[in-house]
Amino acid sequence: MTKDMTTGAITPLLVKFTIPLVLGNLFQLTYNAADSIIVGKFVGEDALAAVGTSNPLMTLAILFINGMCLGAGILVSTAFGAGNAQLMERQVSTTAIAGTVFSLAFSALCVILATPLLQLMQVPADILPIAVSYLRIVFAGLIFTFFYNFLAATMRALGDSKSALYFLMISSVLNIGGDLFFVQVLNWGSNGCALSTVVSEALCCVLCVLYIRWKVPILQLGRRWLVFDGKLLRKTVSYGWASAMQQATVQLGKIAVQAIVNTMGVNAMAAFTAASRIDDFAYTPQQNIGHAMTTLMAQNRGAGKHDRVKQGFHCGMRIEAAYGVLIAVACFAGAPFIMKLFVTDPEVVHLGVRFLRTVSLFYLMPAATNGIQGFFRGIGDLKVTLVSSTFNMVFRAAAAAVFVLVWKMEIEALPYSYAVGWVVMLLYELPMLVRYLRSHGEEL
């Protein structure tokens, strides 16, 4: 099933396309959070801290792969909007072949480097073996991460954001069930959670492939799946690399912040782990709205409908702002209840609530930055998104280091450092947006 986004009312199109993206990511975050909840409840704080300190590296690898798929998806979406089926097919097959080779090599490298990378993050020696074991299992399954993200990004580029949601819902349920089985029944600890995550992703890939074979004629390429276009690969890499580096830069900033958190003690580490998972639930839909804007704008750019590109930006920004206000209120008010879903230790809960209530005050800023990034991705200018994300994370990590290591602030230092990064990001993005629009004879 595909969806042409070059016709029809824009706001309903964006909302209908965004909802499955949001739900899909919420389910994905749910089964990631299930690891933390189950480990925290049934294994202990040391294991929770180990899983939490492994999460930034794990997410870095996943986001790098996802960024490559997202960049390739922009090209697929543009070709689809232009009605060039042959170009679209070559784009899909070339990405599949190159991505398979890359993800296998990347997986092997990550498994080998797991220990030194965690040591570089100053992970305490008493939880290092737990973290290494957990991380290596997840890294071994990166091939499944690639295939799911590639197939999902391709279907989204064709206007279908619902199918990937259905597969992810099934996978999430299986993952949570697997977590409980491996941890409670087999007593495999955090390793059981990692294994459950890999198995769930593998099943998600199988479901995607079966669905495409049965229901998506435009992707039933047969032997054309083996077509490899070296010239097209170079363009794919230029888009994918910029997108991947943008995603990776964001996560590198989080890793730097995690290294600073690791100096604050196990309670702060556990609180930050739980609160960060909750923060992901709040923040990820803002990214999804931006991604929906990207698909709509890329299709209309391919079709030469520039007025709809501008209209899509305005509609998307209004949706971003409404969500930012809603989630800020919900997160501030519900922080104590939500934290208790993850941990029972009163001190850890207290620290997590302080983090969440502070960061919720700033949620309108990432709403704006994600909308602007969605615009620039949609018009094919990924340099702006890469540079702005780099500024964000460099200033975030620097601010966290000053607040915690120099000024000796407590856990509130972390959300304040987030705010610093978002402000710098906006100071770069807004002038770039105004300059682009004026150069094309338009206004905001």
What positions do the PLM features span?
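Short runs within selected transmembrane alpha-helices of multi-pass transporters and secretion channels
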Residues: 69, 137-156, 164-172, 193-208, ...
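Transmembrane helical elements of multi-pass membrane transporters/channels
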Residues: 16-35, 137, 148, 171, ...
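Short alpha-helical transmembrane segments in multi-pass integral membrane proteins
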Residues: 1-18, 76-141, 185-241, 297-362, ...
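N-terminal transmembrane alpha-helices
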Residues: 5-42, 56-71, 75, 100-107, ...
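Helix-terminus/linker motif at the lipid-water interface of multi-pass membrane proteins
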Residues: 26, 30-49, 118-125, 181-188, ...
